[in-house]
């Protein structure tokens, strides 16, 4: 009958969904199991399917010596700092590119797109030389500043698309009442695009949190971030996979918590302006 799905089609659909779920969730579950698995059974041959869970790796990561806990705090400082510095520049820039008439607007957007496409390693040596000469190498501020190379272009592209969806008539009515452009931006536009602002901040946070290239050359032992700490488990004497897995679990928690808490804003932000009357 019309409107009814064929049983085979339904089965194939659910099988494909299950395979997709395993493809994306499988590595995460494997890392979690590796973090609580005894090190002697991690890569045993034949594989050990049943084991007694242990928290030794997580204890090493978070408590004794707890280096990764300190590095996670460093990552949090850098990521939050990158977002706080990013928004005051990217939001007005996105508004200007969306509303003001510019001859070179197309080329400016292409320039930002080029920055997004460029590999971060291309900027490592110039930024290292610059930060060393001005005395900021090894500080949180150096990483926060350099991360703007990634976060600001992305945020401008995101926020411009959200601001484009706001009807211009709303701003014109405010201008008739004598409102300046900055009043329109902060009191009218930003409340209307709040879901997009939250989504943009979340993605900028994740970019900064996961970045390992810039902290690799700009951080010191005191300011090293969690991705750099994880690299320390790759040694010439061997690889401690259970410690790497525990550090990876710790690294996954903040982004996962943020996206779970603000999931409704993610849906609203990504579908903002998708339906028009």
Where in this protein do the model-derived segments appear?
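A structural signal for multi-pass alpha-helical bundles of membrane permease subunits
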Residues: 3-4, 9-277
